[in-house]
């Protein structure tokens, strides 16, 4: 057992007690840490593979039951947004598990892309470990509370907010939105982006994020919300 990991703390955050705690240790072991530590023989990659499938099943079932009249194409769009790397990274952050990741000294996760990838893989690996140890029920109990509310899933079903905003401005105003970027520093001191979306020389929305792509999406969504835009393909809530 790795003495660097406080198993009880992680279990408390998950609200799940492992009968095979070594599974949790393996899930927390990044491949780079195994490569740099001669006493470690297993890393998280196989558990990530399993956890990815478990997450897909849980989210699929959740959406299927939540929206009984929704077609499979729209459900697939929402599912893709709920299981992508950005979402899985957010699940890790929500659970407060990032600090327990065992990662090699040579592995860089300071930048947003590296952090997102590492934390997303961590969530999937932990979910795989929980599934192996306790089955689908505890994996579901961990995952479902992390998912957005029914109301917040609606924008995911309608697609990328940038595309929706462009469709709106083209149809109603015969113009395209313009995105202006300026540097931004997060409260934690990390460099990021402040994006303003401009339509007909007016600021429609703003977004702040560590990645430019995410900041643009947030700005577009704020613009849509401010203009009370509703897609034709609405979902009954």
Swiss-Prot record:
It is found in: Cytoplasm. The active site is at 52, 124. Its main location: cytoplasm. It comes from the Bacteria. Its cofactor is Mg(2+). One of its GO terms (molecular function) is ribonuclease III activity. Its EC number is 3.1.26.3. Residues 160-229 form the DRBM domain. The keyword rRNA processing applies. Pfam families: dsrm, Ribonucleas_3_3. Mg(2+) binds at residues 48, 121, 124. Keywords: Cytoplasm, Endonuclease, Hydrolase, Magnesium, Metal-binding, mRNA processing, Nuclease, RNA-binding, rRNA processing, rRNA-binding, tRNA processing. GO terms for biological process: mRNA processing; regulation of gene expression; rRNA processing; tRNA processing. It is an enzyme of class 3 (hydrolase). It catalyses: Endonucleolytic cleavage to 5'-phosphomonoester. One of its GO terms (cellular component) is cytoplasm. Residues 7-135 form the RNase III domain. InterPro entries: dsRBD_dom, RNase_III, RNase_III_dom, RNase_III_sf. NCBIfam families: RNaseIII. Homodimer. Digests double-stranded RNA. Involved in the processing of primary rRNA transcript to yield the immediate precursors to the large and small rRNAs (23S and 16S). Processes some mRNAs, and tRNAs when they are encoded in the rRNA operon. Processes pre-crRNA and tracrRNA of type II CRISPR loci if present in the organism. Belongs to the ribonuclease III family. This is Ribonuclease 3. The gene is rnc.
């Amino acid at each position: 057992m790795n003495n660097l990991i406080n198993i009880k703390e992680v279990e408390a955050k998950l609200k799940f007690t492992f009968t095979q705690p070594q599974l949790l240790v393996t899930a927390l072991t990044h491949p780079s840490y195994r490569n740099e530590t001669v006493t470690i023989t297993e890393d998280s990659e196989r558990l990530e593979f399993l956890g990815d499938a478990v997450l897909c099943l849980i989210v699929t079932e959740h959406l299927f039951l939540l929206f009984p009249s929704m077609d499979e194409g729209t459900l697939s769009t929402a599912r893709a947004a709920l299981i992508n790397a950005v979402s899985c990274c957010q699940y890790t952050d929500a659970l407060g598990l990032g600090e327990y990741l065992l990662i090699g000294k040579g592995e860089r996760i300071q930048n947003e892309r590296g952090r997102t990838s590492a934390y997303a893989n961590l969530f999937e690996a932990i979910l795989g470990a929980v599934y192996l140890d306790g089955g689908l029920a505890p994996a579901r109990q961990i995952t479902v509370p992390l998912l957005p509310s029914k109301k917040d899933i609606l924008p995911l079903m309608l697609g990328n907010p940038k595309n929706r905003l462009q469709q709106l401005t083209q149809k109603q105003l015969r113009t395209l939105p313009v995105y202006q970027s300026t540097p931004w520093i997060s409260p934690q001191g990390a460099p990021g982006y402040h994006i303003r979306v401009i339509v007909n020389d007016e600021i429609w929305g703003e977004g702040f994020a560590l990645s430019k792509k995410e900041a643009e999406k947030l700005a577009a969504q704020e613009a849509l919300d401010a203009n009370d835009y509703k897609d034709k393909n609405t979902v009954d809530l």
